[in-house]
């Protein structure tokens, strides 16, 4: 399941019936839900029953508890994450039959094709930030599609197929697969060395975020002016710009006086907060 560039990602109409291994997982059920909304036949299995399996079944998916080779049915494409071992009976059967096997991030990338992608990465806060962006865009009447690594409050899914041309996704950096998402806007909440067993070193981990933020498709980077790792990322990109290399526009946020969008007077109480946002010569309460 090697990484694919956006130009290599299969189109949805090329996938046929899709089977998800570990379909109830936080990174999988939203993708499966969006594929169902596109009219793609979906099946999948997980080690144990859950509200996510029941929700997907109600949406039209065939779901199974436990992994068995015969559950692939007529699938043409099998989706798995990095956590699925090669000796998984369903993955082994897919290999034996020569089926297309996609990493979950490639399946998500295919869902993003033809839409304006906003990909949210960072060591901490990805799920919350992705949900907030999707909520704000929905409130503006843009009806974005979204895939989030967790269920929205009051639902059993993290995926939604909207009528608008924007798609907002949570971009998991743990295995480097966030680099293959087609994206116009890259959001980096913070950078704190993590998943070093996959990346090898803190420097490699930081370099991954640099590649994420400076891909040819990225027109805008939104990142923190407070987080030390994000500040270093911004500095590295500005150095690239000074050297004449193409870089995205950068918009920073935070409490720092250097932030393009500044948070002032934050009052945190219970599960809510109030603060003022200041940008350019404008300001407004939130």
Segment roles from a protein language model:
Residues 45-46, 150-156, 259-269:
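Short linear motifs in intrinsically disordered
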Residues 5-7, 145-147, 253, 261-264:
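Intrinsically disordered, low-complexity segments enriched in polar/charged residues with Gly/Pro
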Residues 41-46, 145-146, 168, 252:
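Short beta-strand "acidic-cap" motif of Rossmann-like dinucleotide-binding folds
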Residues 1-107, 259-262, 283-285:
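N-terminal leader/targeting and accessory segments in enzymes
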Residues 16, 44, 66, 149-150, ...:
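Glycine-centered flexibility motif
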Residues 20, 34-37, 57-58, 71, ...:
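Phosphate-binding loop of NTP-binding sites
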Residues 14-17, 21, 56, 81, ...:
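Adenine nucleotide phosphate-binding catalytic loops in nucleotide-utilizing enzymes
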